[in-house]
């Protein structure tokens, strides 16, 4: 609520409580007091009154005075009656004012309530009732604007209130309890709740399934130094950093950590030779001295165990695994594993068996060699990477090597593009080609004929008396190519390439906007004023030519005033934003006008300087 509304409410309350309108107006209209001082003065005035003063104190006081002075009643009875009637009239006027303000407040409260219930879909309000309330409010506004009686206006308002009372049984407690419960769960839940439920990464591919919170927890738990998130622009950079941290950690430790990596999947050696990639069985009697690595099956439930282990290794999984017998032959063991499958009998074993083969070894994919990376001159001069680093990469890292190199290549390509663009802009730094063309073409038009010297500025609309000779001369030329729109943005774009700290350029843009708005409002008057010196066959094109030519003359003069300002290679953001907004206003002003134009014809008898000037007015800078 602003200051005027506060003063109005305070004055109304003071008049109601004190019945002294003159003194309240004196306090309200005192310019030396601030808002708080006025409110304090009205409060002190109300407190100074005697408590228990009746509502009609003024009327009773006037009646008592009349009764106590019978001489005055006999002398001038009409004056006493006038005083009483004036007091009653003032009270009636104040009551009417209060009733009107009460209707306004009730109407606004109902509008706010209906809008809230319509927009909040989670509050299940009856749509039919809301529509009836809206209809009653619209009827209230129509009756109020048409000057209907107070009873009709109050009837519509009371109907809307009665309909709204039917919606008061809507309970918002369920909605508020649900939102408070969600907020409490969000506050109480730890930040790393999802990260704690997921298993720790045991291979490099596991990092691709982690989100940013899980990656952050892994880095905080395994990185001793301070991690700077500002150096990493995306989630992929954080993921690559976590992968590098995992590689360094697995390379430094001789044995993998129990909580992050599974034990090596090496099959147990057997006494009898077995074909490649066949599960091996081992009992405690066959391997009494083999060490048993600790395994963590609870952290990797989806990872299948490639080989059956002994009871000492996984006592929890022993009941679900078949118990092999030491004196079984190789055929019986395989048959017990694949009972429902027809297997060939008496298959001879191979002569040689490679025990170094690993079960479940991932086969490498063959693909075409990648394209050479697009790098800058600095990278070409950099020494090549060490081949030992490349040989030490695992198969999983080689699968992602192409993706990482492609990502780096794209970054280098973007950097090279920005460097070339900056180099290209640096060649034109300090050169404003559009400004130079505007100055040269406008000066050429002014110097060709004496009558082209612009006498007006953009502070007002161009006067016909200043362009009498020019109008008669232009009537012999073809002006059908003059566009009936104003290219405000294109003509004033050179101003955005100046570094102006005093806001002179922004002020000129606002002045140019006012100039074109005034010309659009007075276009009909200018047409009649210019036609008095004619008549002219192409009067609309003639008026538009004078409007634009007068502006170009003033713009050329303004360029001379800001010639000492430093130039920019790119537009000033502040100036450019103002120019875009003002361009919309100018186009809207001229878009509402109607013109009487002729067909465009090619008349080569027009002089070259006039053709260049018309092209410049149409924002066509290909003139030189």
From Swiss-Prot:
Pfam families on file: Nucleo_P87
Coiled coil: none
Compartmental location: Virion
B- repeats by residue range: 283-293, 296-306, 314-324
Region (Disordered): 183-208, 254-326, 341-410
Keyword Flavoprotein found: no
Record field: compositional bias (Low complexity): 279-324
Residue segments, region 2 X 13 AA tandem repeats, motif A: 256-280
A- repeat start and end residues: 256-268, 269-280
Record keywords, A-Z: Capsid protein, Repeat, Virion
Region (3 X 11 AA repeats, motif B) residue spans: 283-324
Gene Ontology cellular-component annotations: viral capsid
Protein name, entry field: Capsid protein p87
Organism field: Orgyia pseudotsugata multicapsid polyhedrosis virus (OpMNPV)
Gene that this polypeptide is encoded by: P87
